[in-house]
Amino acid sequence: NLTDTEYEITLIDRTNHHLFQPLLYQVATAALSPSDIAVPIRSLLSGYRNIKVIFDEVISIDKDNHLAKLTDSQLNYDYLIVAVGARHSYFGNSEWEKISPGLKTLTDALVIREKIIEALELAEKENNPELMQKYLTFVIVGGGPTGVELAGAIAEIAKETMIKDYKSFKPEDTKVILIEAAERILSSFDKKLSEQAKEDLEKMGVEVKLNTKVETISDDGVYTIQGFIPAKTIIWAAGNQASPILKSLNVETDRAGKVIVNKDCSVPGNPEIFVIGDAAYFEDENGKVLPGVAQVAIQQGKFVAGIIKNEIPFEKRPVFRYKDKGTMATIGKAKAVAEIKGIKLTGLLAWLVWSFVHVFFLIGFRNRFRVMIEWIWYYLTKRHGTRLIVGK
């Protein structure tokens, strides 16, 4: 919306790539390569004369002086859009992060991928049955879309995709356990879809533990209110918190640190600053808090760009209204759940819709083509091609 204007636009990011996060779990589970879902930011924006990209990190925001402070410099702004997303929340137990990585970045995905593959390699050469079982047990904490998709993908890896390559253990020796503190997984989905997802996971060999809170995590496993689960591979998908940079705005936030924004997505008292996406706490006209999903951020981005482009004064700005285009989650090969405009889909049809939507929203023909080929190859052969351990 702003590329055909006289505005000078500066995009600041601490990574040099745009990441398609919905498929990040497939990098973590060796289905795709990082380059399949990431594109250099500069290559995306090189054709726009008024956009400058800076590879840096914003440390704080001085809203009184209209300054964004970077690691070793600062930038003036007339308008500021803060779209910094969210990070993992370990609910005050930051020491768990080293043991139980979350999934937000490509680095996270590669760490998880190597943990999974390395666990299988270590199990292959282990003579102690008890220790071997720890290597063959994979625990995912959190039953939201990320946790469900990870659990399904790891189950396919451990019980189908890679199991033929190992001789010391059988598919039934592996355990995939999904832990959820609430009474059902996919709590933001329709209850019937949630139940279907649980049923599909269990058919794939995933043990789903509901109403189970994690008390602590150690190198040897997970302690829950129901007992101890011995495991060497633990993945965190249970909570998010806002970026600490938002604290420098000195405005009201929710418990997760998200900025409580005005109905035009601006910061109270500073109509020139907008906070969108996972960084924002926004209630719709019914008092419902908007979810932290990509379609919310995309719609808010376009909305805010329109306000800036048309230089609409604060008192005349329209109210942002979110249009829900549906929710979906994949569970495994030919297994998914989806709800689109009230229509509920499951199984193969939901999986086909999920596949089409995700390929469609990938940036670039090359990425779309490569992902389609990888998926077709896996569908026909049940084998993933990106199983390297490179961090050792």
Enumerate the language-model features and the residues they cover.
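Short glycine-rich anion-binding loops that position phosphate/pyrophosphate groups of nucleotides
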Residues: 85-88, 151, 240-242
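C-terminal, flexible cofactor-proximal segment of oxidoreductases
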Residues: 305-392
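FAD-binding core/adjacent interface of flavoenzyme oxidoreductases
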Residues: 51-141, 224, 235
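Rossmann-like dinucleotide-binding core of oxidoreductases
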Residues: 132-189, 196, 207-209, 292-308, ...
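Beta1-alpha1 glycine-rich phosphate/pyrophosphate-binding loop at the start
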Residues: 1-54, 59, 138, 145-188, ...
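A Rossmann-like FAD-binding core segment of flavoenzymes
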Residues: 49-60, 155-263, 269
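FAD-site-proximal beta/loop scaffold in flavoenzymes
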Residues: 98-128, 220-223, 228-299, 306
